[in-house]
């Protein structure tokens, strides 16, 4: 479903833990990281799409999370010209997203990137709150900045973060290796990385 302006309705999902860290997912077979996201189908609400994508991409159900906040407005980004598919009609020029901030209320071992037949991700880790804004692919940076700034008012009682001067603490990143049924910790360069295996 693409709107009259050429944007595809989409949901973005930020999952935080009790430490205020957020789940950062590695795209399948790539060295590219992002938050879980996905399109909204016809006759589907944004919340319904969020829960569907949450299960398909992360393996979590509604009972595993609590909705803390939903972005007030649609946030848009345009796709680079190299990613546009001119052979499809209408042409999708970008995404308009409704963002959800979720609290993980169950054990992180329930996270399963292999719950779908065509997984979007093959690994994940916990990172500091602002880390994704600096690390995401360039054409998504502004949307991430806006979403996280809005979410910060919820998590940090309106405390303002300086995105330009703040530096991520790499030693605080968590890395784990995961299988479909189990999670085990491994230490490597003081990081914890969750790697999904089929």
UniProtKB/Swiss-Prot annotation:
Cofactor: a divalent metal cation
CDD domains: NUDIX_Ap4A_hydrolase_plant_like
Motif interval(s): Nudix box: 38-59
UniProt superkingdom: Bacteria
BP GO terms, sorted: mRNA catabolic process
Function, in words: Accelerates the degradation of transcripts by removing pyrophosphate from the 5'-end of triphosphorylated RNA, leading to a more labile monophosphorylated state that can stimulate subsequent ribonuclease cleavage.
Organism: Pasteurella multocida (strain Pm70)
UniProt record similarity statement: Belongs to the Nudix hydrolase family. RppH subfamily.
Keyword Cytoplasm: no
One Pfam family named in its UniProt record: NUDIX
GO cellular component: cytoplasm
Entries under InterPro entries matching the protein: Nudix_hydrolase, NUDIX_hydrolase-like_dom_sf, NUDIX_hydrolase_CS, NUDIX_hydrolase_dom, RppH
Domain Nudix hydrolase: 6-149
Keyword Nucleotide-binding: no
EC number annotated for this UniProt entry: 3.6.1.-
GO MF: mRNA 5'-diphosphatase activity
UniProt name for this protein: RNA pyrophosphohydrolase
Keyword vocabulary terms for this entry: Hydrolase
């Amino acid at each position: 479903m693409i709107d009259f302006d050429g944007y595809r309705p989409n949901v973005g999902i930020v999952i935080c833990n009790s430490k205020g860290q957020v789940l950062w997912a590695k795209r399948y077979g790539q060295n590219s990281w992002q938050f879980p996201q996905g399109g909204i189908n016809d006759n589907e609400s944004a919340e319904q799409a969020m829960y569907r994508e949450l299960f398909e991409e992360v393996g979590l159900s509604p009972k595993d999370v609590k909705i803390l906040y939903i972005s007030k407005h649609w946030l848009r980004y345009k796709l680079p010209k190299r990613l546009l598919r001119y052979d499809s009609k209408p042409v999708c020029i970008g995404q308009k997203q409704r963002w959800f901030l979720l609290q993980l209320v169950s054990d992180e071992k329930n996270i399963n990137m292999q719950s779908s037949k065509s997984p979007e991700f093959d690994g994940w880790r916990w990172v500091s709150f602002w880390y994704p804004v600096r690390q995401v692919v360039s054409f998504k940076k502004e949307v991430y900045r806006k979403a996280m700034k809005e979410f910060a008012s919820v998590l940090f009682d309106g405390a303002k973060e300086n995105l330009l001067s703040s530096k991520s603490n790499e030693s605080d990143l968590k890395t784990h290796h995961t299988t479909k049924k189990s999670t085990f910790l491994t230490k490597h360069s003081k990081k914890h990385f969750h790697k999904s295996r089929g």
